[in-house]
Amino acid sequence: MDVFWYALVGLLLAGYLALEGFDFGVGMLMPFADTETGRARMRRTIVPLFLANEVWLVAFGGLLFGVLPVAEGELLHALRLPFLGVLCAWFLRDAALWFRTAYEGAGWRRTWDIVLAAASLFLAAGWGAVLGMLVRGLSTGSHGHAVASAADLTHPFTLLCAALAVTGSLRQGSLFAARSLPEGSSLRVAFGRLTRVLTPILLVLPLLVAALGTVATDAPVAVATTAVLAAVGVYASDRVQATGRTGVALLLGAAPLVALPALVGAVNGTTVLATRAGVGSLELSQAIADSASLALMTAIVLPALVLVALGQLWFWRVFAGAGNRR
């Protein structure tokens, strides 16, 4: 059961990244809409969907605290500066989405469009970098605990994972925004071209992750397998998109974003927080909550997650086409 709960925590994070990838991508693309009508329509494609998507982040944080209380504290300590940056970007992204319509001034709206794009870019890159560092393993501080050093943050493998998250989000955003724009509109055509440009890049990036992972991690086969599956997902997404099935293409196109948290488990196994030296690492057996707490969560959390998933399905069915209807 310990592995089940650990996997469920990872699944919630993967679900958050898969869904928020649309929002990150649309946010990054917002300033490139050439008219106010186009920018307003793009905003409506992700409002209020981004709130529903953030439920998975809240669920991830709550379950991490409940199931892996020791790991939660160690992760926040080791990654406090990267997490602080991601948290600030999250606040700014949400503020930009809400405050943009609070005042009619063109300068006001343009400013928030730029904030939205920058915060969305930082969010995508930040999550990619954090997960890349966890895959590779953190440094060990003088106190004997795991810590994310400047060298960890700027390592080529970390930067490559950040680039994968940004590019994957951009492709998802261009696909998602285009489906809500009028057929034949200049913005829809532009996003279609962008998708075609990003697809080959996103086919190559996972393979670069696999290549670099052979020397940056101790599990080259796990890295290569996960990365190749991500590339296959992108290829399948491109083929499906050519037939006009955008919904399925979006589902398959989330593969690179899902691959990032999957890599953490595939490479590190039951080591919840890995360090390259081994000192300061945290094993699942050390981090997991006691059996009484897990039994309580089995009775309460699992049914609640099922209800949340059903609510999400309804929410997406109702609001996913909001950009077209308003």
Regions found by a protein language model. Name each.
Residues M1-A52, V58-G62:
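N-terminal signal-anchor module of multipass membrane proteins
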Residues W5-Y16, L76-A89, A117-L121, D152-G168, ...:
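Alpha-helical transmembrane segments
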Residues F32-R41, E104-G107, E183-S185, G321-N324:
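Juxtamembrane helix-boundary/capping and inter-helix hinge elements in multi-pass membrane proteins
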Residues L49-S120, A216:
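Membrane-interface helix-loop-helix modules in multi-pass inner-membrane proteins
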Residues F99-T246, L260-G269:
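Long, contiguous internal "core" modules enriched in hydrophobic/ aromatic residues
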Residues V166-S180, L305-G321:
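Transmembrane alpha-helical segments in integral membrane proteins
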Residues A249-V258:
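Central hydrophobic cores of alpha-helical transmembrane segments
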Residues A274-L296:
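Short, membrane-exposed interhelical loops at transmembrane-helix boundaries
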